[in-house]
UniProtKB/Swiss-Prot annotation:
Protein name: Methenyltetrahydromethanopterin cyclohydrolase
Reactions accelerated catalytically: 5,10-methenyl-5,6,7,8-tetrahydromethanopterin + H2O = N(5)-formyl-5,6,7,8-tetrahydromethanopterin + H(+)
This protein's UniProt keywords: Cytoplasm, Hydrolase, Methanogenesis, One-carbon metabolism
Residue ranges crossing the lipid bilayer per the database entry: none
InterPro entries reported in the protein's UniProt record: METHMP_CycHdrlase (IPR003209)
Localization per record: Cytoplasm
Record keyword Cytoplasm present: yes
GO cellular component assignments: cytoplasm
GO biological process, one term: one-carbon metabolic process
Pathway where it operates: One-carbon metabolism; methanogenesis from CO(2); 5,10-methenyl-5,6,7,8-tetrahydromethanopterin from CO(2): step 3/3
Role according to the record: Catalyzes the reversible interconversion of 5-formyl-H(4)MPT to methenyl-H(4)MPT(+).
Provenance organism: Methanococcus maripaludis (strain C5 / ATCC BAA-1333)
UniProt-listed Pfam families: MCH (PF02289)
Length: 323
């Protein structure tokens, strides 16, 4: 079986070798673990964001960035593009932010290959029938703080590997790399909703592709959380090849997937978050989805699409002004 950790290791090694070119910093902790700072004390870069995203996806996706990406020629933004032939494993088995890493005063949302070793969360891996048994653990952390030896020891213990084989990549939400990797979740937003909200067997998704604009760095982590989510919710477009079974209602799946199916659709995400008193659990989970979903049903040959991009909300979210 494919190992998302082993598939990602050469990408990590490439980042280490190109640290100056990528504007990142590599730190060797006293216990032997390796930390890649991709935006805490460094600038980072689009290329670092691309590689960070590819690692989040377990090395099982092609990731590209188009600087000339546009939405209806009304607002020009960089766009990140994702393609994967292993959608369930890459997005839910690796990229999903399914590990809340809390050690002492340190907290970060963890995603990427190491989750498949720690089985975080176990239910997801049972649903997609996947596990990894690599001897190296690679975890991507969304945090404005760098992890220390205690965090690395915790990850090593949960993953069952020697701490010297732990690699921790860190990028704050309010950073170039952070913005790229969150927009790079455009495909995962769809597969996550398929599984968690619509209870569709994501193993039937045989190929997936997506594109989403990348948010400019407009403020602190809270402001960027709003902006980065809006890039996917109102600008993300996805394409799924699904091999359905007889009895699967793929048209209903397609209509139910996009963010426009949520009651809170039409507002910038930060406004929705404020209205929920900053409590994620009070937010309609249906909003966490791409703006447009296109599905090709391989069994019936049907092609269908639902949803639309909403440039006006993106402009409002970014407080954009045309000079």
């Amino acid at each position: 079986m494919i190992s998302v950790n082993l598939a990602s290791l050469p990408i990590v090694e490439d980042m280490i070798n190109r640290k100056e070119d990528l504007n990142i910093e590599v730190i060797k902790l006293e216990n032997g673990a390796t930390v890649l700072d991709c935006g805490v004390n460094v600038m980072g870069s689009f290329e670092a964001g691309k590689l960070f995203t590819k690692i989040c996806l377990g090395g099982l996706a092609h990731v590209g960035i188009s600087i000339s990406g546009s939405l209806d020629n009304k607002l020009v933004l960089p766009c990140v593009k994702i393609k994967t032939s292993h959608p369930a494993i890459a997005t839910l088995g690796a990229q999903k932010a399914g590990w809340s890493v809390s050690v002492g005063k340190y907290f970060a949302m963890g995603s990427g290959p190491a989750r498949a070793l720690a089985m975080m969360p176990k239910a997801t891996y049972e649903e997609i029938d996947y596990k990894d048994e690599a001897d190296v653990a690679i975890l991507c952390l969304e945090s404005s703080q760098l992890p220390d030896e205690n965090v690395a020891d915790h990850v090593a213990e949960k993953c069952g590997v020697d701490v010297s084989k732990v690699y921790l990549l860190v990028a704050p939400t309010a950073s170039m790399v952070g913005a790229v990797q969150i927009s790079g979740r455009v495909v995962e937003n769809g597969t996550y909703k398929m599984l968690e909200a619509l209870h569709f067997d994501v193993r039937k998704v045989k190929f997936a592709a997506g594109i989403a604009p990348v948010a400019p760095v407009i403020g602190d982590d809270l402001k960027m959380m709003g902006a980065t989510n809006d890039m996917v919710l109102y600008g993300g477009r996805t394409y799924y090849y699904v091999k359905s079974d007889e009895g699967d209602d793929i048209e209903n799946l397609c209509k139910s997937l996009p963010s426009c199916s949520a009651e809170t659709y039409g507002k910038p995400f930060l406004d929705v978050f404020k209205e929920a008193n900053y409590d994620f659990y009070k937010i309609d989970k249906g909003i966490f989805a791409p703006a447009v979903v296109t599905i090709n049903d391989l069994r019936t040959g049907k092609l269908m699409s639902y949803g639309e991009t909403n440039v006006d909300v993106i402009k409002k979210s970014l407080k954009f002004s045309q000079l």
